[in-house]
Amino acid sequence: MESRTVGVEHDVALHVGVAGDGPDVVVLTGGPGCVQYLERDNLSPPGHRAWYPESRGVGRSGGGPHDMERAIADLEAVRTALGVAQWLVLGHSWGGDLAVRYAVEHPDVVRGVIGIAGRGFQRDRHWSEAYEAGLGSEPVVDIEWVPEVNASLSDSFTRWIHEPDLWRRLADCPVPMRLIAAGDDIRPSWPLAQLAALVPHGSFSTVPGVPHNFWSTRPDVWVEAVTDALRDLTR
């Protein structure tokens, strides 16, 4: 895995890992506010050049708490600095939700979205109750995160999902989206299924028998799921 440093607005330097050759795909992690836990050679999608930015204020990147608008602006700054005209966007957990917003706001540069085990655009009470009831039953995966970045991005996410034109913009988004649930995730998957039915070129599927962080517990299954989705988006 090669490491690069990319300068973005406000004199902030972001860490970006890169591996492989082929069509470009940018990989976004969850949290929000987690380190770039998917930056591992054994998780890199075969036949693609994968970029692994670490978000502002986290890990090896400079800066601090920020909102979703800044997160997307950083992605665009990274893409431009790297000389990438278009790329596919792969996101896990909250990273999948960010990937969808990125596609809505920049459909000209996002070739397709793969969102795995996302939350979806909701703060639903029943969803939260199901999630909280399952806490403690998931395999423990130790991931570093920054609480202040988590809080600022979570607040920004809540504001965005309350925007009056959100569903109209999603329904008009031309970017193909593959939304994938983890079969043993404690997070209910119905928001992903609804989103796949709403966007013009969406699909929903479930990887059976794996938990939320199956990139860690079953990396072979993760790579297979990602490879299949990328193949579907690029054929």
For the regions a language model picked out, list residue spans one by one:
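Flexible "cap/lid" loop of the alpha/beta hydrolase fold
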Residues: 100-104, 113-138
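Active-site nucleophile elbow and catalytic-triad environment of alpha/beta-hydrolase enzymes
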Residues: 152-169
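Conserved alpha/beta-hydrolase "acid-adjacent" motif
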Residues: 186-191
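Catalytic histidine-centered segment of alpha/beta-hydrolase-like enzymes
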Residues: 210-223
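Conserved HGGG/HGGXW glycine-rich cap/lid loop of the alpha/beta-hydrolase fold
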Residues: 8-62
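Active-site loop/oxyanion-hole signature of alpha/beta-hydrolase fold enzymes
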Residues: 51-88, 224
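Gly/Ala-rich beta-loop-alpha elbow adjacent to hydrolase catalytic centers
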Residues: 91, 95, 99
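Short beta-strand/loop motif that positions the catalytic acidic residue
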Residues: 173, 179-181
